[in-house]
Amino acid sequence: MDASEKHTRFGGPSVFLTWDERYQNTWEGEVREPASFLKENISKLPKGKALDLAMGVGQNAIFLAENGYEVVGIDSSQVAVEKAKAYTEEKGVSIKTIKADLSTYTLPEKEYDVILNFYFLERGLIPKIKKALKRGGIVVFETYTMEHQKFDKPFNPNYLLQENELLLSFIDFKVIFYQEGVVESDGKKKAIASLLAEKVR
């Protein structure tokens, strides 16, 4: 799976079917390692209850569970959800999995200490993320920017961040870390924005 294609998953029922088909093929780049940005910042996160949005096969959710979190993971693909369940069993941890369309799903308010959003952009979710975090909770957010079009297949620009958009979207939070630019991973360049921010009120 090309993680960048996650941005198209809310295009309609045919997209959901395509994602189920993709997740059925393990050769489609199944990522089983947690995101580097998450691993690097795990010590900065408050303990408690965590939510992983668009979790895919659950690698980040499982990493949090292994580090003592009570974790909820949501994805639109039933196949991804089933794989996440299987991987949690392999790892000997437990996460609550939910199949849902995040463009319409209602998040409970003041419920989570940590919320993850990796390589998925649904702008309407940002206000929901803010409400779903407890005071003192932290959002961990990383996804592609417009500049990424230089390095990968054509993207729908609606699913790419504008310059400083992610930072400005959380201007009412205490920003612990923010970085935007081009990085290299596995010999490939990608343009991303990475944010760690705390809800202070």
Model-derived regions, located:
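Conserved beta-strand signature within the Rossmann-like core of class I S-adenosyl-L-methionine
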Residues: 137-144, 148
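A short acidic, Gly/Pro-enriched loop at the edge of an enzyme's catalytic core
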Residues: 107-114
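Core SAM-dependent methyltransferase catalytic element
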Residues: 184-201
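Conserved SAM-binding motif I beta-strand of class I
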Residues: 70-75
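Conserved SAM/SAH-binding beta-strand->alpha-helix loop
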Residues: 77-79
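Conserved SAM-binding strand-loop segment of SAM-dependent methyltransferases
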Residues: 91-102
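Conserved class I S-adenosyl-L-methionine
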Residues: 2-45, 48-56
